[in-house]
A protein has these predicted regions:
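Canonical pleckstrin homology
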Residues: 146-152, 186-235, 270-274, 312-365, ...
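Surface-exposed beta-strand-to-loop junctions
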Residues: 2-6, 27, 66-70, 86-96, ...
């Protein structure tokens, strides 16, 4: 066996070696990484390898299977490995700092990689990152009633638990004052149409208000995102001192469990089907729908309660609708009424994770699609699996960013 094949075999064995962490990308956790930084001594996925190529003074990459590896380089990889290198470069990652996963957008991955290896922010002797009390700067914000993005000044007052923004630099007062306890932030790059697009949501007069913002700098928008997360963690820590930090971190911000177009009819099931953009919020157990993906407010929402409370998801369309061009669909039944939905387009049918979700008050919704709807659409199971406890006794109403009393997200336990 030649050196090339022998060293390739050694590398493939290293990928599966127990106690090394090499079986997953050192940066995003993707399984079965096929690339490696032979200057850092880590195994990474194809997507993250593209980021590493941008700073060759710090990291140099090779394909594990396709490139030639000499003996000394393989020895270096053997001596290091993912867990050992992560212990060095991730020694002091703040609890609020978002660590991206394989499914996250590229700007989060890129800034995480640069923060670790280029700026060395999380090393033991690195610069201390603390949750700043205040942050101020300009972001491009989409107008509420049009598609134009305008430059707006945002001010975060973390200690006061407020985020404000101004339409004029020298305005008399803020256009909006947002309470951190009601705020969520999630990157929505494809929906916004910008690689740095961030969606900020908060409660306003019983509705969910959406702000769509971006910044030209990837570092700046990710810094804003983590500043909001730091403020959220400060709020959660003060509001729920009995809970350990490890249980609060998953509640800081959240991504939608699923988003996409479907068509729905009304509670009488005689109304025409209308195409709507749906967003499934597992943490608040709500299915929101919009006329357009970038609307400032939802058109309506359905709370997904438990089956014991009278909520149900039926994997079919009512008889009066079945037999038209829509061959299958979903009906969401609530104690008050029912609604019918049909999914759009065909390729999304298998991806709506309905099973974990069903909770408080809503209506019946019906969805359909000619290709049929498999079991993976059942919302009740997905939500019920995650929400099996109640809010702490002293708190009522929309605590922790909006859970009603009697319902709480995964991780919170009954404290009474």
């Amino acid at each position: 066996m030649g050196d090339r094949e022998r060293n390739k075999k050694r590398l493939l064995e290293l990928l599966q070696a127990a106690g090394t962490g090499n079986a997953h990308c050192a940066d995003c956790g993707a399984a079965d990484p096929d690339w490696a930084s032979y200057k850092l001594g880590i195994f990474i996925c194809l997507n993250c390898s593209g980021v590493h190529r941008n700073f060759p003074d710090i990291s140099k990459v090779k394909s594990v299977r396709l490139d030639f590896w000499d003996d000394s380089t393989v020895e270096f990889m053997t001596h290091n490995g993912n867990l050992r290198v992560k212990a060095k470069y991730e020694a002091r990652v703040p609890a609020f700092y978002y660590v991206p996963q394989a499914s996250d957008c590229m700007v989060l991955k890129e800034q995480w990689i640069r923060a670790k290896y280029e700026r060395e922010e999380f090393m033991t002797d690195g610069k201390t990152i603390s949750p700043s009390g205040n942050r101020e700067g300009f972001l491009w914000k989409r107008g509420r009633d049009n598609a134009q993005f305008l430059r707006r000044r945002f001010v975060l007052l973390a200690r006061e638990g407020l985020l404000t923004y101004y339409t004029k630099e020298e305005g008399k007062g803020p256009k909006a004052v947002i309470n951190i306890k009601d705020l969520n932030a999630t990157f929505q790059t494809e929906k916004i149409g910008n690689p740095h697009g961030l969606q900020i949501t908060y409660r306003r007069e019983g509705h969910i208000r959406n702000l769509f913002v971006y910044h030209e700098s990837g570092k700046e928008i990710v810094d804003w995102f983590n500043a909001l997360r730091a403020a959220r963690l400060q709020y959660l820590t003060a509001a729920f001192p009995e809970l350990p930090e490890s249980e609060l971190v998953p509640l800081i911000t959240r991504n939608y469990l699923k988003q996409g177009f479907m068509e729905k009819t009304g509670p009488k099931q005689r109304e025409p089907f209308k195409k709507r953009w749906f967003a499934l919020d597992a943490q608040e157990r709500r299915l929101l729908y919009y006329k357009n993906p970038l609307d400032a407010f939802e058109q309506g929402q359905v709370f997904l309660g438990s089956q014991e409370q009278g909520y149900e998801v039926k994997e079919d369309l009512p008889k009066g609708i079945r037999g038209n061009r829509w061959k299958a669909g979903l009906t969401i039944v609530t104690p008050e009424r029912s609604s019918i939905h049909r999914e759009w387009p065909q390729q999304q049918v298998t991806h709506w994770p309905w099973e974990p979700l069903v909770g408080r008050r809503s209506s019946q919704l019906t969805l359909g699609h000619p290709a049929g709807v498999p079991r993976s659409w059942q919302p009740l199971l997905a939500v019920n699996a995650a929400f099996t406890c109640r809010l702490p006794g002293p708190y009522h109403g929309p605590a922790l960013g909006g859970w009603g009393s009697g319902v709480c997200p995964q991780g919170l336990r009954h404290l009474q």
